[in-house]
Swiss-Prot record:
Top-level taxon of origin: Bacteria
Assembly and interaction partners: Homotetramer composed of a dimer of dimers.
Organism: Thermus thermophilus (strain ATCC BAA-163 / DSM 7039 / HB27)
Classification of source organism: Bacteria, Thermotogati, Deinococcota, Deinococci, Thermales
GO terms, biological process: tRNA methylation; tRNA processing
UniProt name for this protein: tRNA (adenine(58)-N(1))-methyltransferase TrmI
One Pfam assignment: TrmI-like_N
Amino acid sequence: MAWPGPLLLKDRKGRAYLVFPKEGGVFHHHKGSVPHEALLEAGPGGVVRTHLGEELSVHRPTLEEYLLHMKRSATPTYPKDASAMVTLLDLAPGMRVLEAGTGSGGLTLFLARAVGEKGLVESYEARPHHLAQAERNVRAFWQVENVRFHLGKLEEAELEEAAYDGVALDLMEPWKVLEKAALALKPDRFLVAYLPNITQVLELVRAAEAHPFRLERVLEVGWREWEVRLPVAHPRFQQVGHTAFLVALRRWKAS
């Protein structure tokens, strides 16, 4: 029996569960259990029932769903921010992108899918346990071999000059890597940083003035979901609040 990658199960209340099917495995729900073989037989888009009769729908997880439910060793980059970073970086298939601060690998997956099988993501993480978890997360969801993981700090890495089409940073002190990023980034391409607080934003923008970078924009990404139960519609009571600021810098040719 060929075992697929991760599957997402949803119960009648919309609660989601990420499952990695394996031979002899069993999924346990508070309203019963179901063997992994049954999930494979139902397949994505199908339905299974636990031994107590609870109905569960079976799905292939989207990238957003996978990021929200995968195991995490660090605070995740939310899907709304990761997709915005890909847009700000202006990535396309075949490009080469540099990432620092791999974390749990969520942003890495967005970058890898954006550059495609002919592109390349070079991801640096200084903490071994974060890097190990990130590599497991990425390999479980994304079978395309277009990500290289590196243990270490970006500022200490040996990089080719003007070899990258984009730089994505999720670091507490991204200003420390600006010199290295400027060396590696192609002219007229973008560096995008993910920063939780505005003090970090100000520090980064101030530091960028000493390097061949120009500030393009600073933004927050909103995400407002609605509850629609005919004939009633209203915003959901639980909303995603502030997650981070995104800072986009454009690399200029050094004068």
